[in-house]
């Protein structure tokens, strides 16, 4: 019996809940750090610590770091393992974010943000890969979405903390405390790392069948203890024996059947981040440019942020019921339309209303595609494929920050027209090139 068959036959229970809780905690602090940029950014500019140009570089540095981290560590987790990568990246992120909180100058703030970004970007890739491999296919989309629910709960938390702390000064500026809290929480998550197992699918793909069997035996014993039985196996054979025994090669991404998926995901990732982070990282700055005060911009974005977990919750409910491919297409078009509404809103009620709906659609979209992208490649290539294609979103986000800074002089509506075009192209490429994945075992999708 293969590792895949043993994973698929496990009942969903205590192990899966514990595993998802620990991984979700890591995702919470990852997304907390990504989204605090929007909330502290307005304060950094108003206080004079950063100019608009320097804020643009600050945002770009974080995404460039994510690009490098995704390429080096995200793809590297195919060699070092999912658990090892998850632990290492949490440590990198927390140490450099903590140091960034005490940056004495704008140059230090920007430089340290780059190194913190290395941990943040790759961690997201590893989480998607890790969960996809450990959870049975019947719940894969739902459980990936749950990690996103936990992650996006960080958005209202970051917004509320920023609203409370940014205007204050206790020993140091309030925005520094917002960063310290995130780094401290990530270190706490790192402390709980001992309870995470390595991915049995990854161990199998590396030929470490005895270790994979030992982990699965432990999970089976725990999962079936209440029934007083465990799955009976006659030894573990490798599912990848029917594919390739050796480690996957980067160049395999450019051969059939993975070529079209690689091209589709590269285009998708390069474009989706324009629409997603164009709003998420710049909303308070857009409001400042509209003449809204710092305090009111933080209040508006705090109200908008309250709905953040609802999008991933909807994804958790629909992910295994609705085909993920078409969910992504519909939501991309919805984000485009709502973005145009937000960009042309002036009245506070319209700003908050369109902003809340846009946030809900954006984060539902995010949860759906995180489950989808990790299904595209076999275990031996999964982190390499996801890491390489996802890295384009980080590179795109870095240049998008610079582009938005330049386009913003022509007005907020112009920026959102640009974002809408990007999301329409996203819907087109997924609709035309994306495969269907719902209800299939990973090994079936990867053939």
Task: Please provide the spans of the model-predicted regions.
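Transmembrane-helix signature of 12-pass secondary carriers
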Residues: 1-447
